Swiss-Prot record:
<protein>
    <recommendedName>
        <fullName>Caveolae-associated protein 3</fullName>
    </recommendedName>
</protein>
<dbReference type="GO" id="GO:0032991">
    <property type="term" value="C:protein-containing complex"/>
</dbReference>
<dbReference type="GO" id="GO:0005829">
    <property type="term" value="C:cytosol"/>
</dbReference>
<feature type="cross-link" description="Glycyl lysine isopeptide (Lys-Gly) (interchain with G-Cter in SUMO2)">
    <location>
        <position position="128"/>
    </location>
</feature>
<comment type="similarity">
    <text>Belongs to the CAVIN family.</text>
</comment>
<dbReference type="InterPro" id="IPR026752">
    <property type="entry name" value="Cavin_fam"/>
</dbReference>
<dbReference type="GO" id="GO:1901003">
    <property type="term" value="P:negative regulation of fermentation"/>
</dbReference>
<feature type="modified residue" description="Phosphoserine">
    <location>
        <position position="199"/>
    </location>
</feature>
<feature type="region of interest" description="Disordered">
    <location>
        <begin position="141"/>
        <end position="263"/>
    </location>
</feature>
<comment type="function">
    <text>Regulates the traffic and/or budding of caveolae. Plays a role in caveola formation in a tissue-specific manner. Required for the formation of caveolae in smooth muscle but not in the lung and heart endothelial cells. Regulates the equilibrium between cell surface-associated and cell surface-dissociated caveolae by promoting the rapid release of caveolae from the cell surface. Plays a role in the regulation of the circadian clock. Modulates the period length and phase of circadian gene expression and also regulates expression and interaction of the core clock components PER1/2 and CRY1/2.</text>
</comment>
<keyword id="KW-0043">Tumor suppressor</keyword>
<keyword id="KW-1017">Isopeptide bond</keyword>
<dbReference type="GO" id="GO:0032922">
    <property type="term" value="P:circadian regulation of gene expression"/>
</dbReference>
<feature type="compositionally biased region" description="Acidic residues">
    <location>
        <begin position="157"/>
        <end position="170"/>
    </location>
</feature>
<dbReference type="GO" id="GO:0005901">
    <property type="term" value="C:caveola"/>
</dbReference>
<feature type="region of interest" description="Interaction with CAV1">
    <location>
        <begin position="135"/>
        <end position="203"/>
    </location>
</feature>
<dbReference type="GO" id="GO:0001558">
    <property type="term" value="P:regulation of cell growth"/>
</dbReference>
Length: 263
């Protein structure tokens, strides 16, 4: 009777095959605990992996940002290099044009030089801008000489002086030669003007007596002509003498004085 009292009764919901022991329940609970622990470990590993992935993503993002910044800087440098290349190209074109222009000028100069050398008229003078004509070029002026002396000494005097000073001072000898030739031209113009004035002054004198002759005397032009001939004789030497200071005859000489100052 005691054994029947100790036996457990039927568990509600238990299989009808037999009673469930406590050992099986414990083993099941242990298995469940081990499974939960493994799940937790897996979740922790997944969390760690997720954190590593997040860090790698951040690093990738930072690398992409640095790459974008470097790309911007490279694009800016490329733009600057392109602008510099364009400027250099424009400068190179301008330099090439200048070189072509200078080459053309050099060719023209060489052609002109060849022509001058072929003609034998090449004269090279080295001078300063503010050079003065020496004073001795103005000392011996042919103004005080007479017309006959000038005709005799005119062509010889410049050649002698040029021959003496051509070896030492070529620039001064040329200035002297130019000065003396200018003075000779001025003197020739003076002589031409004086001869013209003498002829113009001699013409009215023989004309006036025949006009007055018939009014005063009715004897004829035979007596008027000899009276006009002695009047011409004193006039001709006066044409060779220095010109009288008359106001009407000084006006043509004014350009002659200007020619002397310019020479």
């Amino acid at each position: 009777m005691g054994e029947s009292a100790l036996e457990p009764g039927p568990v509600p919901g238990a299989p009808a095959g037999g009673p469930v022991h406590a050992v099986t329940v414990v083993t099941l609970l242990e298995k469940l605990a081990t499974m939960l622990e493994a799940l937790r470990e897996r979740q922790g590993g997944l969390a760690e992996r997720q954190g590593g992935l997040a860090g790698s993503v951040r690093r990738i993002q930072s690398g992409l940002g640095a790459l974008s910044r470097s790309h911007d800087t490279t694009s800016n440098t490329l733009a600057q290099l392109l602008a510099k290349a364009e400027r250099v190209g424009s400068h190179a074109d301008a330099a090439q044009e200048r070189a072509v222009h200078r080459a053309a000028q050099v060719q023209r100069l060489e052609a002109n030089h060849g022509l001058l050398v072929a003609r034998g008229k090449l004269h090279v003078l080295l001078f300063k801008e503010e050079t003065e004509i020496p004073a001795r070029a103005f000392q011996k002026a042919p103004e005080l000489l007479g017309p006959e002396d000038q005709l005799v000494l005119g062509p010889e005097q410049p050649e002698d002086e040029v021959g003496e000073s051509s070896d030492e001072e070529p620039v001064e000898s040329r200035a002297q030669r130019l000065r003396r030739t200018g003075l000779q031209k001025v003197q020739s113009l003076k002589r031409a003007f004086s001869s013209r004035k003498g002829s113009e002054a001699a013409q009215p004198t023989p004309v006036k007596p025949p006009r007055l002759g018939p009014v005063r005397n009715s004897e004829g032009p035979a007596e008027g002509q000899p009276a006009a001939q002695p009047a011409m004789e004193p006039v001709l030497p006066s044409a060779l003498e220095p010109e009288p200071p008359q106001p009407t005859k000084e006006d043509p000489e004014r350009p002659v004085l200007q020619i002397e100052s310019a020479a």
